[in-house]
Amino acid sequence: MGTRSTSVSDAVAVLDERSREIFRRIVEGYLESGEPLGSRNLSRLLPMSLSPASVRNVMSDLEELGLIYSPHISAGRLPTQIGLRFFVDAFMQVGDLSAEDRANIDRQVRAESGGNPVESMMNEASRMLSGISRGAGLVITSKSDPVLKHVEFIRLEPTKALAVLVGDHDQVENRIIELPAGVTSSQLTEAANFLNAHMSGQTLPELRKQLSQLKDDVRHELDALSRDLVERGIAVWAGSPDEGKPAQLIIRGRANLLEGLGGAEDLDRLRMLFDDLEKKDSLIEILSLAESGSGVRIFIGSENKLFSLSGSSLIVAPYRDDDDRIVGAVGVIGPTRLNYSRIVPMVDYTAQLVSRLSRNPL
C-alpha cells in the first residue's frame, strides 16, 4: 500500500497516545544513533505494554501516513522528512538555556579580541556553533551600507581630488577621483554642499536613487562641471572593492559533516552542499530565509531548495544592527539528524549575543 502525504494537523488528529509514543521513540532513536528501530526493540522501550505484533501494526499506520519508512526489507523504521517536520513542530520541546550554557557561549564568542574584534567574534561564534552540533557552524555577515553623514572633496593636484565620505558611525572612506578639466575650487565646494544637502539619513544606494529622480533639480542647481563632479564622486564609491559582495560566509566544522558518511552517495551529497555554500546566491538565500520569520528558522531537507540535493538541514537566526535592521545570520548546517532541541536555543542565544556585541565590539 502506498503512503499518503500528511500535514502536522492531520497527524495530530489521527494519532492516538500509543502511536505518538512509538513515533516519538523512532525519531529520537534516529536522532541519537541514525539507526532504524524495529518492533521488538520498541516493545521493550515503550512505557505501555505492547507486543511486537501490535507495534508493527502501529508502525504500518505511521508508514501509511508518510511519517516513517523502512530503509530495507525486514528492517526497522526511520522518520521521513515529513515525519521529522512533524516531530519538530509537534513534539520537540525547546527550553531556556541554563545560566552555565549562556556563560559558556559568552566566553567562547568573546575568546578572541585582538586584531579585528568583530571578525574574531564572528569566527568564534561559528566555531562554537560547530562544537555544540554534529554539523558546521556558520555566520553570514552582510555588507551593510552606512548611513551617510558628510562628504568633502579635497584637491590633491590639478586633475585629481580626494573624495572623503563619512558615515553615521564616523567610519571614513577615501577615494581618489579624476577631476573634470577646468573644475575650480568653488565647484568642488558646490558639489560637496549639494550632496550634503541631499544625503542626510540615507545610504549610498538610496542617495543614488534619489539623485536619479532629481535630475531636473541637479540641472538647475549645478553647472555642468559640478554635475559631472557629483556623478564621479558617487560612481567611485559605488565602484568600491566591496560592491557586489552582499555577504561573506564564515564556516567552521566542515570535518563534522564527514563523520558517519554511508558511502559514495553520501560523499556526493556533501560535495554538493559545499559547492552550494560557495555560491554568492546561496548566501543571499540563507539571509532571506533568516529574514522570512521572527527568531530561529528550521529547514529540513528539501524544504529548503538550496540544500535539497544534499539532504541537509539548516537552523538559522538573524542578527541585527543598532537600527534593528537584519545585517547577518548565524546557524548550523548538518545532516537531518541534528539535535534540534539542543541546537535551536543555542542558535537563538548566539544571534542575540552577536547582535549586542556587533553594536558594541569587544
UniProtKB/Swiss-Prot annotation:
InterPro entries reported for this sequence: GAF-like_dom_sf, HrcA, HrcA_C, WH-like_DNA-bd_sf, WH_DNA-bd_sf, WHTH_transcript_rep_HrcA_IDD
Gene3D superfamilies: 3.30.450.40, Heat-inducible transcription repressor hrca homolog, domain 3, Winged helix-like DNA-binding domain superfamily/Winged helix DNA-binding domain
Keyword ATP-binding belongs to the record: no
Top-level taxonomic group: Bacteria
Molecular-function GO terms, alphabetical: DNA binding
Record key words, sorted: Repressor, Stress response, Transcription, Transcription regulation
PANTHER family the UniProt entry points to: HEAT-INDUCIBLE TRANSCRIPTION REPRESSOR HRCA
Entry similarity comment: Belongs to the HrcA family.
Function (record text): Negative regulator of class I heat shock genes (grpE-dnaK-dnaJ and groELS operons). Prevents heat-shock induction of these operons.
Protein name as annotated: Heat-inducible transcription repressor HrcA
Source organism: Rhizobium etli (strain CIAT 652)
